[in-house]
Regions:
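Hydrophobic, well-ordered secondary-structure elements that form the walls
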Residues: 19, 31, 68, 104-108, ...
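Carbohydrate-binding surface patches
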Residues: 85-122, 153
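C-terminal beta-strand-rich structural cap/linker in extracellular carbohydrate-active enzymes
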Residues: 139-159
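Active-site His/acidic residue clusters
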Residues: 41-47
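Aromatic- and carboxylate-lined catalytic core of secreted/periplasmic carbohydrate-active enzymes
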Residues: 48-87
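Solvent-exposed beta-hairpin/edge-strand motifs
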Residues: 120-133
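Short, exposed beta-strand/loop patches in secreted or surface proteins that constitute
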Residues: 82-85, 95, 134-139
């Protein structure tokens, strides 16, 4: 997360979204939620001390982490099934679901796209985008989603 040569904020958000949706405990290093900076070269310089002045925080990143944390607090996620589906070489989906609720996290490292996912056996009476910019709707047992370049999107579905 501190490698400026490979860091891409939008792709990073997708990786964090996947982490929050996968089973197990999400793990953040202090300050990640507010976009704290660091410098490369040594472990000591990899992270600056925590910045407590909110005017220096990346509020968009904080809003993103809050949305992921809120989704993660759903009690049903503790016993939900999961599935990972490859969309193509630049996108994949993490699905968490029970008989009554589901989250679909679509992680896009590529260009603007439209995706059709098989949602057989997932609850799909209602669909809401929890985080991200795009459109999502169900048609039969398919979830059709369109979203922008490098945009990752979290969708909630329920009966």
């Amino acid at each position: 997360h501190n490698d400026k040569a490979v860091f891409d904020r939008d792709i990073y958000k997708g990786a964090i979204m996947a982490m929050y949706m996968l089973p197990g405990m999400p793990n953040l290093y202090y300050g990640d939620e507010v976009g704290i900076k660091g410098r490369l070269g040594s472990n000591e310089g990899a992270r600056f001390p925590m910045e407590w002045r909110e005017e220096y925080w990346d509020m968009d990143m904080l809003s993103f982490h809050r949305a992921m944390g809120k989704a993660r607090k759903e009690k049903w996620l503790g016993y939900a099934s999961y599935r990972i589906e490859e969309v193509d070489e630049k996108a994949f989906a993490v699905l968490r679901f029970t008989d009554h609720e589901a989250y679909v996290a679509l992680i896009n490292r590529g260009e603007k796209r439209e995706v059709k996912l098989d949602i057989f056996a997932l609850p799909s009476d209602r669909v809401e985008i929890v985080y991200g910019k795009g459109e999502a709707k169900t048609e039969g047992k398919e979830l059709n989603v369109s979203f922008e370049e490098k945009e990752s999107i979290l969708i909630k579905m329920w009966k």
